[in-house]
Amino acid sequence: MAFQSALEALNSTTHRDASTNPILNSVVEPLRDSLSLYPWLLPKEAVPHLLSWGIPNSGLGVTPHPHPIHKTVETFLLFNHWHALARLPSTVMFMKPSKFQKLAALNPKFQELINFRLTAADTTRYPSTSLTFPSNSICFMHDALMYFSPAQIVDLFTQSPALETLYCSLIVPPESHFTDLSLFPEIYTYKISGQTLHYIPENHHSGSYNQPLQAPSWLKISSILSPSLALSVTKLESWGPVHSILIQRGLPPKPSLSARPPVLPNQPPRATTPNSQNQLLHQTSQLFFQLQQPQLSLVSFRIPDCVELPQATFLRQPLRHRLVPTSVYNALFTYTRAVRTLRTSDPAGFVRTQSNKPEHAWVTPNAWDNLQTLSVNAPHRPQVCYHFFSSPVARLKLHFAQHWRAYLLALTPFLTTSPLLLPLFNFNTPFPLPRLLSLFRRSVSSPRLLHSILPSQLRGAAIPNRPLPLWVTKLHHFLDSHSLLPTPPIRPRIELQRLPLMSLIPKPKIVLPLLSLLLSSPTIYIHFFQAQTPQQLHDNYHLHLHPSRFELSWTLQSYHVTQAQSFLPLLLPAPTQAQASNPAPRPPAFHAIPLPPQPSTSSSPPLQEPTLSPHLIHPPLTREPSPLNGCACDSALLPSTAAMTSAEHPTPLNPPTPSPTPDVPPPDSPGNPSLLKQVPPEANLHPIHNPDLPSSTTLPSGALTLVPAKTPSIYANPTPPSSHPFTPLADDPTAVGPCLPFHVLHPADYFPLSAEFLTRTRHVPPSSLSHPKLNCLLTCFSELSGHSESDLWLSLQSILPDSQLQNPEVSTLGLSTDILTALCFIYHSSVTLHAPSGVYHYGIASSSTVYVIHYQPGPPPHFSLSPRLAASAPRCNPTNSRLVRQALRFKLNGEFLPFTQAYAHESSITHAKNLISNMKNGFDGIMSSLTDSSKGPSPREKLTTLDSLIDVAAPREVSLIHIAGFAGCGKTHPIQKLLQTSPFHDFRISCPTNELRSEWKRDMQPTAENVWRFSTWESSLLKHSEILVIDEIYKLPRGYLDLSILADPTLSLVIILGDPLQGEYHSTSPHSSNHFLPSEVHRFKSYIDCYCFWSHRIPKQIASLFGVVCHNTNEGFVRALTSHPPNSKNLTNATNTALSLQQMGHHAITISARRVTFTEAHTILLDRHTNLLSPNNCLVALTRSRTGVYFVGNLHLASNSFGTNYMFSQALCQGTIDLNNVFPHIMPHLPKMYEPIRSRSNRFVSGSLNFRPTTNSRLLSSLTKPTHLPPHIPTNHSLDVLVSNPVLLGETLDPRLEVLHLPPTRLPLHLDLLPTVPSSSSFSSVDHLFPTPISPAICGYTFENLAAFFLPAHDPDLKEVLINDQKSNQFPYLDAPFELSCQPSSLLAPIHKPASDPTLLPGSIKKRLRFRASSSPYSITPSDQLLGQHLFSSLCLAYGRNPNSVLPFQPELFSECICINDYAQLSSKTQATIVANHQRSDPDWRLTAVRIFAKAQHKVNDASIFSGWKACQTLALMHGYIILVLGPVKKYQRIFDSKDRPPHIYYHCGKTPSQLSQWCQTHLSGSSYIANDYTAFDQSQHGEAVVLECLKMRRLSIPDSLIQLHSHLKCSVDTQFGPLTCMRLTGEPGTYDDNSDYNLAVIYSQYSLNGHPILISGDDSVLCGTPPPSPLWPTLKKMLHLRFKIERTSHPLFCGYYVSPHGAARNPYALFAKLMICVDDKSLHDKKLSYLSEFSTGHLAGDLVTSILPSHLLPYQSAVHDFFCRNCTPAEKILLSLDPIPESKILQLILKVRWASQAFFSYLPQKARELLVARSSLPSLYSNPKVSQLESELLPFSQ
């Protein structure tokens, strides 16, 4: 980028060619080599593929070839890849002799060529057949490996004892093992038939060939094992379908990663037992540190970036038909959830816009269909919620609401078995049960004793017992029959007894099983009929709708060869014997590794594991278990999977099992053991972190030499929004005065920070505002105060402006605590608000009336009188702790601490254990070396004890506050003052160095008993306190915070200080494993609320270097010295350098020393270590001094031109350092704060809002059913809307137009953004004087008398022409009505009507269009470039701009232009018209294809009246994409042009005739003018216009992609009549602006102008005065293709108006003709007001109109005036009155006005304006963005 910027700066100088000469010299030689080595003509789509493969091809070859891509790859393989591998004498096999001679000439190591004729086609390739095998140690096999099996390769090595290394080229598509469709169809295609793969290179069928289907198996093996030989197989390179394979002997097979011995064919697999978790962790850690242990052999291949779609429910789909491009999937996923309304046809329309792109040619139609079908799942959303601040009870309720089914499932076994186990535990009832014996002298039941003794005589169930003697029974019968038994008493008699539980259950054998079944039925019902749990829904949503990137990869396997097979089909003769005649036996087939398994979903059962080849030995997998069950297999194999993996999950497919061969042993053979069980995966000790974030803040040395982009403004970050983001308080008509805090306008004794919101003084009585719907705050206050809600609302309207009571926030969210403060002021009360984050006070602090209100943040947020039932849980909300609240309230010099909240940090056992282990082993810290202690355990013993405690410790949470900021911002001082307050007395300080500890002690001056609180980081671990402050946290080992939390059980609050930009800790021991932990910078980044981006230390010059706010009054300096100044402070790069300087008498420390501040300037030594400095250390070195910096030493290292240290070089040359580029992973994410916090807002808002999208559930359920649409679909058809997303916040009236009627292919082109442009603050100009013009003297010409002789009698057919033997029809007269003269007035000028004149467009093509000679794009010539540059300089001269200045791009303004452009495109045509033109968004319509059609018009002007046949104006119909993409660019340019345009240059775009007249009166003078109207202006603009337009866009930093699109379109336009050259097309975006700018640039190139007034409108122009011509004009005129029509006159005509210093007047000659035409064709009623308005512009000038118009046109002016006086109503003739309009009539008109434009509003008198504003329901009616968009003007941007 630095070189590019330098070259761009030299564009306009003569040094550019000399500067670019080295670039050209460096390009010439590679380009020559490329054209010489790769001369073939390549398709343009192939060049990116070749470059990505590392093949240096220029793409400029011209030699044709049937398959040039393969030829280029083959050439690179032979003459680049193999050329470098032939280091010893080598042999080449299977190569044409001519090709071998070229190869040997390039590298003499290629010494031997061996060819074998194996097929009939080999006769043409090889002149002879070799009789020997390779004799060299290195052999190259050219494009033949796919025809050989591993057994044959083993025989080749056996027959060639000297052969050690075999390099092979293999041509096979890697994706052929799972599909028969190519992933690169533009490079190759293939077809699988049986066991044959038919390969077709680049659709060249003559060059196609067949190869075995088993050939891809060469890409899946890592070694070939035979009883006598072991060969390794390695893939060196891959270039699409071409692979370089290395086969070499002498290397053993790769050992297994498992602890088990490898399984041999004669050894059954040993059973494995699952290890415990500790053993698994131990094994994982051992594997982690044993670097020499081999890893799992994986191989991957480059394929298009794609994702794998999930399987359809209960349906199987091939993997190939579920692969879609990742970019398309992500874009469609976002699109279906971003549109306001989603129709069922919208996904198909979006897919259609992508499916025809050439880069997506590999995607199958089935895949596109599956993608659009899957995308209708847009209504599905993850059912998640984020309740961070809920109470424990609320969280518990939410937890049970989400997981109650899991708990019910866990309790089901107990509930179902408990009734069945009840008979086993038949205990008596735990409490006695009452039993009634008698009542009112009647026996109800007998006593228990008698009941047991006499069962046969008493009622009730018999209880078996021992029978009594017979005489006792007889005695009982006798007494009972004679009524001699005692009579029961009257009162009830009750007996208590404990019965068995089973006796209480009726029919327990039936009831208990039924009860068990009943208890299990809810779980069964929920499992089969209810939806999935929230966790299952969440997991399945992300699993299926967020698929990971698909990768073509698999695990390499070993291939076992039991017996070598002959390499050749015919055996070669022995060296001393004749060649054998008998052929060798046929070798067995090379069994392919099975095809990849298809992924099994939850809806389909798992598939059986495919049977593998009997010769493949798989290494055991230890990282991922196979998802399939093991099964018996007829081979000696280890379990593995050769399946290709997509992201993390395997995708199995069940292929057909290959047929057995005679070499395969039978399945029952004892040598075929079954597959081993799968090995469980090993746990990962160190989790994988984000790869995009480095583990260290140290950048590579190369990064230090980068020149970053421009430094952004230090105020680039927007300030926080105000408390009223939706209300235009400043424009509220019900208030007066400035915006001030509430406590200033209404003084009272408020609670702190409760009345800080802004408001204004109300000056009108209460308005009748509607009662708010979300009024829970009013309800609570009403119940507490006793006042009705209507009284409260009325009282608020008496003190607050209407804009604060009725706005989108109140209507959508509810009332805020600002309203509560106003109520407290009105009723002199105070409110205590209880919220989850704390207790807040509002209102009058001295009031005796105190109300209590509770606030719940929701959703929805709500004010209530009673709190929700909630319990307190420790650490549930860290901000609610006592210490955190005190820290939030602490102020020092009126400033709060720079943080907004505390975070709950949970300690990590892994981090703490890593650090304590390194400390115990002496790798980090020095305490482990201290083995002696005067009393108690030694420090080493304490570390050992702490290490053992960490082993059994559990994670715990503490509150954490992070104070971060730039060097010298003052992080430490406020914390020191905080610790001196009483709530923070129990603290301790942990510092990284002794010097820093001494500084803390010096600043805080502790007493003797508190000195222990200040310690270094190691000794601090052995102390305890409630509060821990860690200074310079990033200079401490990783995991120190976690270890400190676990080492101190009394710790409750941690405050960490540090700057993430100043680097972090690096251990000096090479054995320390602390660096394996993730960086603390990125771990603590989420805890940084505010980054203090200011400095009190560094001087102003250093601060400007970094773009930091400086509070140091010293200007400072950066200088270079030749030697060290005496008594100076010196910073060095290394410790040994510092020691050397100290020995020489200088004060020296290393650069990495932090928290060091020098009052005087210090030096920075530049030496050989400077290039190794990290940006962090460079930042520290530059920010140590309050005065300045000296550089000494090797100053070349910090030179501006060729310095190797970027930061030092920028400092020395007084440049700027872009911290975002220096620290790209840190600085952009820091929440920068530019001033201290001086107020904290405690503002709450209540209300509810439904933000979930509305889903058409009926349509969603019927997607699988046939769809019946009406025969004619109306534009408002909404039955196919699937999802509707609501508006969360915003105006009730959506400023965006409906897009439901747009075609599905056009809807993705609309961004549908919300406009955010503020209201315009422009004011209309008021004339100082209001002169009344003198009434003109009207001549006595009547309209009818002049019209009767205006059109002479003539034959219209004589004006027609013949085109292709067909007469034109521009002067139709048959059946045309007329009354003014002898013929129809329409014959005054030709009529262009394509519907009735088929010759109109063909006859106009020659004059209106210019064509290219061929279909090749137009090439910008050097002449075009020079002329375009000159025109751009002239245009900049006209605007007073610097041609070399480049303005930064403003994305916010550009998005506003997108909104305006979209609005204009949707509102300029009816919905029916847009639907009818749906083909404009057809994806099959090329962007460069333009449809030309004729414009229908009856153009009447001076040139066309009484003229003959004229060519029509052509319009260009472009693709909707062009209009919607380049339209905002032109509107963006218009904004800057309108701001920069000088007042003496007038553009008529968007101006009214009255404004034209006013401008002429202000700027024009004299009586000499130059008018010009070009001939064929659009067709005369060639390539120079394209250059001019591109330079205009580059000046505004328009994205290059849009500039290139514009240039490509202008040079490649193609129409139905042929390709067009560069020309202006009416209908392209920005036609008027570009034409006007081109015209202005030509005028400033033609004349030497100095403030001359100029009027420009497209090709029309008027120049005031007679300026001298430019000296360069004669040369430039020859280069231009324009045809001028220059006229020097005193009455210039501009856009149909005569202009003069007295104003402008409509040309009465053309207006008279138009009135004649509309009178004859009866269209006067429709056009009269328009013509009257045009005429009134000149008429209102009074008698000056005679000076404006030429004298010969005054009769027509009189006739037109006569016509309007006799044909207009009195109300219409007011426009012709020179007197002002009566105010009463204006006020009557205002009462009927619904909306007014800015132009209309500016003409109204003051009283009418006030009335219109008072009646307006909009905050700013006349300048509202919606009104401006309706006018299609950029009025808000005019200022």
From Swiss-Prot:
InterPro entries: (+)RNA_virus_helicase_core_dom (IPR027351), Alphavirus-like_MT_dom (IPR002588), DNA/RNA_pol_sf (IPR043502), P-loop_NTPase (IPR027417), Peptidase_C21 (IPR008043), RNA-dep_RNA_pol_alsuvir (IPR001788), RNA-dir_pol_PSvirus (IPR007094), TYMV_endopept_dom (IPR043181). Residues 58-219 form the Alphavirus-like MT domain. CDD domains: Tymoviridae_RdRp. The active site is at 776 (for protease activity), 862 (for protease activity). Keywords: ATP-binding, Host-virus interaction, Hydrolase, Methyltransferase, Modulation of host ubiquitin pathway by viral deubiquitinase, Modulation of host ubiquitin pathway by virus, Multifunctional enzyme, Nucleotide-binding, Nucleotidyltransferase, Protease, RNA-directed RNA polymerase, Thiol protease, Transferase, Viral RNA replication. Specific enzymatic cleavages by the host yield mature proteins. Residues 600-614 have a biased composition (Low complexity). Residues 1093-1224 form the (+)RNA virus helicase C-terminal domain. Residues 1567-1673 form the RdRp catalytic domain. GO terms for molecular function: ATP binding; cysteine-type endopeptidase activity; mRNA methyltransferase activity; RNA binding; RNA-directed RNA polymerase activity. The record marks 871-872, 1246-1247 as: Cleavage. Residues 253-277, 578-623, 645-703 are annotated as: Disordered. Residues 584-599, 652-670 have a biased composition (Pro residues). Residues 935-1092 form the (+)RNA virus helicase ATP-binding domain. Pfam families: Peptidase_C21, RdRP_2, Viral_helicase1, Vmethyltransf. Residues 723-877 form the Peptidase C21 domain. The keyword Metal-binding does not apply. Its EC number is 2.1.1.-, 3.4.22.-, 3.6.4.-, 2.7.7.48. The keyword ATP-binding applies. ATP binds at residues 965-972. GO terms for biological process: DNA-templated transcription; methylation; mRNA modification; proteolysis; RNA processing; symbiont-mediated perturbation of host ubiquitin-like protein modification; viral RNA genome replication. Disulfide bonds: none annotated. Belongs to the Tymoviridae non-structural replication polyprotein family. This is Non-structural replication polyprotein.
